[in-house]
């Protein structure tokens, strides 16, 4: 059910084709496409915000309180362009970035990174071991359901490290995935119509004084 909302977008983890010819009609067509894309973006993000959960935390039978996300001001959204960490530090920014990656079918990267962040905060050796195995089976091993793109040597090292799990088991892989997102997905997110719309300041309404 959840994945069905994202099947209308491109699958190649790259920007959409912007070619739509030239001339007034083509310009009108492009503007219509942009409005449609922006509307789809807002629908996807709204759905994602209502149904998102931390990938590092297991789901329980109890109903969890819905997370509250406050839409940023244009000035706050513009800060996300200064550094990738600024985007990740914002709850709304992180949720928007996750929705963006999901629309490009690349969400495994941010989900792995978040799972590693949760993993590093774990204190109990028993929980550390069980979480390490889950991250490995979800993201690392061959044909994992959310397999990330890392080299064979790093995968082998992780397989050895999780036998006696420590908080640094996934450090190398997490750094590589972070770098991949920072240099690839992050710039495309900043160019997306959704992000550009967040940065736009609403037009000021001026009222003319009544003639006396």
UniProtKB/Swiss-Prot annotation:
InterPro entries noted in UniProt: RGS, RGS2_RGS, RGS_sf, RGS_subdom1/3, RGS_subdomain_2
Which SMART domains does this chain map to?
A: RGS
Show the GO MF annotations. Answer: adenylate cyclase inhibitor activity; G-protein alpha-subunit binding; GTPase activator activity
Consult the record and explain the modifications the protein receives after translation.
Answer: Phosphorylated by protein kinase C. Phosphorylation by PRKG1 leads to activation of RGS2 activity.
Residue numbers spanned by region Necessary to inhibit protein synthesis: 79-116
Alphabetic keyword roster: Cell cycle, Cell membrane, Cytoplasm, GTPase activation, Membrane, Nucleus, Phosphoprotein, Signal transduction inhibitor, Translation regulation
Report the locations given in the UniProt record: Cell membrane; Cytoplasm; Nucleus, Nucleolus
**Pfam families, per this entry?**
RGS (PF00615)
Q: Which GO terms describe its biological process?
A: brown fat cell differentiation; negative regulation of cardiac muscle hypertrophy; negative regulation of G protein-coupled receptor signaling pathway; positive regulation of cardiac muscle contraction; regulation of adenylate cyclase-inhibiting adrenergic receptor signaling pathway; regulation of translation; relaxation of cardiac muscle; relaxation of vascular associated smooth muscle
Domain RGS positions: 83-199
Q: Subunit details for this protein?
A: Interacts with GNAQ. Does not interact with GNAI1 and GNAI3. Interacts with EIF2B5. Interacts with PRKG1 (isoform alpha).
Write down what this protein is called.
Answer: Regulator of G-protein signaling 2
Source species: Sus scrofa (Pig)
